[in-house]
C-alpha cells in the first residue's frame, strides 16, 4: 500500500476512535479522499478512452484484475449504497439523479458479479463523462453525511429493516461473488463502514488503477 495513504489511513482510524480527536479524524479522512480523488481525476486527463477498458491482468487474482472504468464504478456504487441506504437511510444519488441512464450502465449493482471479459464489455458501455459526474456527486453527498454524524453515532448498528431495504433494492447481485457484501456491511457499525467503504476501499482500488495504468503505459 502507498506509504503516505497507508499512514493517513492509520491516523484516521486512531483519531476517530476517540471523542476528543474525532473532528480532527474526519478532517484527515477528507484529506485522504481529496488526494485519492486527484489520482482518479488524473486518469481522465492522461488516458485515452480505450485505456479505461483495458484489462492487462485479466487472469490475476486481486483488485488489479479489473479495468479502471470498472474500478471507479465499483468504488462509488459501494459508497453511494453504504452512505445513503445504510447510514443516512435515504435515496441513493444513482437513483435520485437517473445515473443508470446517464452513465449508460447495463447494471445497477456494485459489479462484484462481473468477471474477466464481462468487466471489459461493461466498461466499454459506460459514458465516462457521466461516470465522473457521478463520482463527484457521490463524494460530496457522502461528506455532507459524514459531517452531520456525531461521535456517538459511530457505534450505531445497521438495523434489520435497513438490511431488508438493501436487499429489496437489488443493488447487490445474488451471485456468490457479491451477495456476501450484504452481511459484511450490515455486521459493521457506522464507524466500521466509514473506515472501510469511505477510505480503505478507495485506497485499494486506486492503487490497482495505478498498477493497470503503469502496465498499459510503462
Regions found by a protein language model. Name each.
Residues 1-42:
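Terminal targeting/low-complexity segments that flank the catalytic cores of oxidoreductases
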Residues 22-26, 61, 120-125, 187-191:
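A short, mixed-charge helix-start or loop-turn motif at secondary-structure junctions
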Residues 122-132, 151-165:
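Acidic, Ser/Thr/Gly/Pro-rich intrinsically disordered interaction regions
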Residues 25, 32-43, 78, 124-127, ...:
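Alpha-helical packing segments of well-folded alpha/beta enzyme cores
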Residues 1-11, 54-113, 140-143, 147, ...:
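Short, contiguous alpha-helical
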Residues 112-120:
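Cytochrome P450 catalytic-domain helical core, especially the substrate-recognition surface
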Residues 14, 18, 42, 46-49, ...:
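A structural signal for alpha-helix termini and helix-coil/disorder junctions
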Residues 35-51, 173-176:
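Short, contiguous, well-structured surface segments enriched in hydrophobic/aromatic residues
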Amino acid at each position: 500500500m502507498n506509504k503516505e495513504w497507508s499512514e493517513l489511513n492509520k491516523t484516521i482510524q486512531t483519531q476517530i476512535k476517540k471523542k476528543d480527536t474525532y473532528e480532527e479524524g474526519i478532517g484527515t479522512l477528507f484529506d485522504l479522499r481529496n488526494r485519492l480523488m486527484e489520482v482518479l481525476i488524473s486518469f481522465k486527463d492522461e488516458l485515452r478512452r480505450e485505456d479505461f477498458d483495458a484489462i492487462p491482468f485479466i487472469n490475476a487474482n486481486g483488485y488489479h484484475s479489473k479495468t479502471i472504468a470498472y474500478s471507479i464504478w465499483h468504488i462509488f456504487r459501494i459508497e453511494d449504497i453504504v452512505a445513503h441506504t445504510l447510514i443516512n437511510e435515504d435515496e441513493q444519488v444513482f437513483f435520485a439523479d437517473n445515473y443508470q441512464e446517464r452513465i449508460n450502465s447495463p447494471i445497477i449493482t456494485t459489479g462484484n458479479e462481473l468477471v474477466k471479459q464481462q468487466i471489459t464489455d461493461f466498461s466499454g458501455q459506460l459514458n465516462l463523462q457521466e461516470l465522473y459526474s457521478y463520482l463527484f456527486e457521490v463524494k460530496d453527498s457522502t461528506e455532507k453525511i459524514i459531517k452531520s454524524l456525531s461521535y456517538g453515532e459511530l457505534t450505531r448498528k445497521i438495523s434489520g429493516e435497513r438490511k431488508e431495504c438493501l436487499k429489496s433494492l437489488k443493488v447487490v447481485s445474488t451471485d456468490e461473488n457479491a451477495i456476501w457484501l450484504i452481511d459484511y456491511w450490515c455486521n459493521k457499525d457506522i464507524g466500521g463502514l466509514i473506515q472501510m467503504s469511505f477510505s480503505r476501499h478507495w485506497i485499494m482500488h486506486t492503487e490497482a488503477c495505478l498498477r493497470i495504468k503503469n502496465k498499459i503505459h510503462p
